[in-house]
């Protein structure tokens, strides 16, 4: 889960056979104690449906799904590019460019380390 700048709010790494819908609920449940969830989460069509809205409502979160446009060819989807940009940032780091890790907690730690590095670089450019 990322904010509007593409910075990680919280993350979870799971098995490939786990549906993304279950992963979103895991993010809500496994967040650090005291961390507030955003009031609204923007997601793609994989998270649409009443079941997902009810599951998110338990945590006080509204799920808004971004509908795909019917246009042919390459179309930039509103808001969805924010998450895709974060994945592109991760792809620049060798340990996250492929799934090298055997343990999911190591992959998660690498994601957080890369995000810390990116944020420090951004802050140093501001000074």
Segments from the language model and where they lie:
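Polybasic low-complexity intrinsically disordered regions
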Residues: 1-64, 68, 75, 111-115, ...
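Basic, amphipathic alpha-helical segments enriched in Lys/Arg and hydrophobic/aromatic residues
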Residues: 54-55, 59-63, 73-127
């Amino acid at each position: 889960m990322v904010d509007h700048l593409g910075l990680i709010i919280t993350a979870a790494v799971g098995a490939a056979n786990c549906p993304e819908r279950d992963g979103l609920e895991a993010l809500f449940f496994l967040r650090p104690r005291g961390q507030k969830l955003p009031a609204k989460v923007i997601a793609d069509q994989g998270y649409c449906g009443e079941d997902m809205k009810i599951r998110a409502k338990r945590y006080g979160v509204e799920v808004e799904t971004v509908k795909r446009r019917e246009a042919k060819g390459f179309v930039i989807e509103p808001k969805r590019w924010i998450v895709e940009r974060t994945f592109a940032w991760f792809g620049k780091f060798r340990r996250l460019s492929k799934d090298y890790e055997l343990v999911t907690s190591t992959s998660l730690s690498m994601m957080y380390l890369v995000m810390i590095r990116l944020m420090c670089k951004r802050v140093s450019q501001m000074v």
